[in-house]
């Protein structure tokens, strides 16, 4: 997990240190104060990649740097310091393997999702692997292609595959639906069905009350 993030001369303030709590952290403030910027930097500290544009300090900033501490599954958590290199506008860090924080998921301000999986996104011997997977909102449902290769089938296809194959992932999905449901109106997975004329695949459905509702047509709140 990310334990600390210490910023110097990169935009939010001349000197800003955040000590993160072990589980839930709330960041509040008016528009334009840098809440999303802080989350972008937290993502970078955990994954050493950027979910969008890299953080660029103001031209007048002297010696901008980022210092952070990430606690992995094993080993001592040591501070990592990156000093901005203006010649190529990068934040260099040591080439050694970063700590293993586990899978990192970032729900971005634009409605998309970024996912970093150390088992799939970090291999020094295979630099051609994607640095991370960045999903637009529709790609979470419909799937993601990277460099002409299908890397994710999307939740709709996975849902039907898990359900028809009676796979353990479907049990986890059912439990997630149960936990997220209103007490008086539980959400349950319904039978897959064809939705659009001429479509060659089934889509997942939800049982909401006495009705079967295709997930693709469910309300935005659901």
Q: Which sequence ranges carry the predicted segments?
A:
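Short amphipathic C-terminal alpha-helix that caps PH/PH-like domains
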Residues: 42, 221-222
